[in-house]
């Protein structure tokens, strides 16, 4: 297996223009495909998860032109649901942002579809979404294990009506249903069962649906009313915001070893909840400055925090590693859904933090971290999880090197992450 050893860094300084947001890119691509008219997406993310969505749309008969650097995509919308004259198998890798929304959208379509992916995708639950789709008239079959992909979908249309979705595991189930609902034959009311996790991701979904001309009535996140008979309208020029989760590594690096780092492409007007990460860093003692389209972080004496991170689970992983540089015991709470991401992130994070010398308690939905007086040089396993690789790169901001196994796994969202980090790093 390939590995990368990062030598100790004495200071971090500079500016990073963020790659496009994965969450925004895949939602906008799907809605652009269903819309009437053309949408030109700029600052699209070029990564594995987006490529899986683009390949699936091509198989489904969507025409698009992709620029040479793959960051501009002009999509000719179908103006309706997908139709396939022959059975199709769509391979979606480990892209939850493609699997869940496409599963819902294909129920509206005519045709027979199999949705599959890599082995980890077959361990990521989808039952709560399938239950809701079946309530609304969908024909969905599990091909291997109950409640998990691969799925076989026979497109019959969705008739809407009253539907209940369990929101306690992943907000992507609700996102998927919301995006399909305007094309159902009758009005849809979605009721949320359990506590809705990752609410800011629902805000992203609703915001993008509105940009494509569709209205949803959000009744305090407990119920959503979607009138039938709506059509998505091409959004013309659509700028994909920078990825706020990706920003977290650079902002944390500055908080630990700045100098200062300016990230551009997100700011105080961002639609992504993960910009709240900067507030968490500020609570730890970093100095943060906000602009409309940038965030600047500067070094501070970092102190431990004890916080509920349910609203920003992805960026919370970065806090877990920043905790190695903070005084006291850091507690990251209410992150059960780490367990159903690219890997079981609670178990993975606990294992790897212990390798560098931290004292860690791993609970069912929380993790507490006590930093060691001296970080140890360790070889970090990344579990085919892009965020594990990026998080643990921050260990090099000590006077200890760190070795990252399978560094190319960052290609899921940020293929040139290590190059960008090197540009900002001054070797010790």
From Swiss-Prot:
It holds the Pfam family EPSP_synthase. Belongs to the EPSP synthase family. One of its GO terms (biological process) is chorismate biosynthetic process. Phosphoenolpyruvate binds at residues 22, 96, 124, 172, 345, 387, 412. Its main location: cytoplasm. The lineage of its organism: Bacteria, Pseudomonadati, Pseudomonadota, Gammaproteobacteria, Vibrionales. PROSITE patterns: EPSP_SYNTHASE_1, EPSP_SYNTHASE_2. Pathway: Metabolic intermediate biosynthesis; chorismate biosynthesis; chorismate from D-erythrose 4-phosphate and phosphoenolpyruvate: step 6/7. Its EC number is 2.5.1.19. InterPro entries: Enolpyruvate_Tfrase_dom, Enolpyruvate_Tfrase_sf, EPSP_synthase, EPSP_synthase_CS, RNA3'P_cycl/enolpyr_Trfase_a/b. Disulfide bonds: none annotated. Keywords: Amino-acid biosynthesis, Aromatic amino acid biosynthesis, Cytoplasm, Transferase. This is 3-phosphoshikimate 1-carboxyvinyltransferase. It is found in: Cytoplasm. One of its GO terms (cellular component) is cytoplasm. It catalyses: 3-phosphoshikimate + phosphoenolpyruvate = 5-O-(1-carboxyvinyl)-3-phosphoshikimate + phosphate. Catalyzes the transfer of the enolpyruvyl moiety of phosphoenolpyruvate (PEP) to the 5-hydroxyl of shikimate-3-phosphate (S3P) to produce enolpyruvyl shikimate-3-phosphate and inorganic phosphate. The active site is at 314 (proton acceptor).
């Amino acid at each position: 297996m390939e590995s990368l050893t990062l030598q100790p860094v004495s200071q971090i300084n500079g500016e990073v223009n963020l790659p496009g947001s994965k969450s925004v890119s895949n939602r906008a691509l799907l809605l652009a495909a269903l819309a009437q008219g053309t949408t030109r997406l700029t600052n699209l993310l070029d990564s594995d998860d987006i490529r899986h969505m683009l390949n699936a749309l091509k198989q489904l008969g969507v025409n698009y032109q992709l620029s040479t650097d793959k960051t501009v995509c002009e999509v000719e919308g179908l103006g309706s649901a997908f139709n396939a004259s022959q059975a199709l198998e769509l391979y979606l890798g480990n892209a939850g942002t493609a699997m869940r929304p496409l599963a819902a959208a294909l129920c509206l379509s005519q045709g027979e579809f199999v949705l599959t992916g890599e082995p980890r995708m077959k361990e990521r639950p989808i039952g709560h979404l399938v239950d809701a789709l079946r309530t609304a008239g969908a024909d969905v079959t599990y091909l291997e294990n109950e409640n998990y992909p691969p799925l076989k979908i026979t497109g019959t249309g969705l008739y809407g009506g009253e539907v209940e979705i369990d929101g306690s595991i992943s907000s992507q189930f609700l996102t998927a249903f919301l995006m399909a609902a305007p094309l159902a034959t009758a009005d849809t009311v979605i009721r949320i069962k359990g506590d809705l996790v990752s609410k800011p991701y629902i805000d992203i979904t609703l915001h993008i649906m509105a940009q494509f001309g569709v209205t949803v009535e959000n009744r305090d996140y407990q119920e959503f009313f979607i009138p039938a008979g709506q059509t998505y309208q091409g959004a013309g020029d659509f700028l994909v915001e920078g990825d706020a989760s990706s920003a977290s590594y650079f902002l944390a690096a500055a908080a630990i070893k700045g100098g200062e780092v300016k990230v551009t492409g997100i700011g105080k007007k961002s639609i992504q909840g993960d910009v709240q990460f900067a507030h968490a860093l500020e609570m730890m003692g970093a100095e943060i400055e906000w602009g409309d389209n940038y965030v600047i972080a500067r070094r501070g004496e970092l102190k431990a925090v004890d916080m509920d991170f349910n609203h920003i689970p992805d960026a919370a992983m970065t806090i877990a590693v920043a905790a190695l540089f903070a005084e006291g015991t850091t507690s990251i709470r209410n992150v059960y859904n780490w367990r159903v991401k690219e890997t079981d992130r609670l178990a993975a994070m606990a294992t790897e933090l212990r390798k560098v010398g931290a004292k860690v308690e791993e609970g069912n939905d929380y993790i507490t971290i006590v930093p060691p007086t001296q970080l140890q040089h360790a070889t970090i396993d990344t579990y085919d999880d892009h965020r594990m690789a990026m998080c643990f790169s921050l260990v090099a901001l000590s006077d200890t090197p760190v070795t990252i196994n399978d560094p190319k796994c960052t290609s899921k969202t940020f293929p040139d992450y290590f190059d960008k980090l090197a540009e900002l790093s001054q070797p010790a």
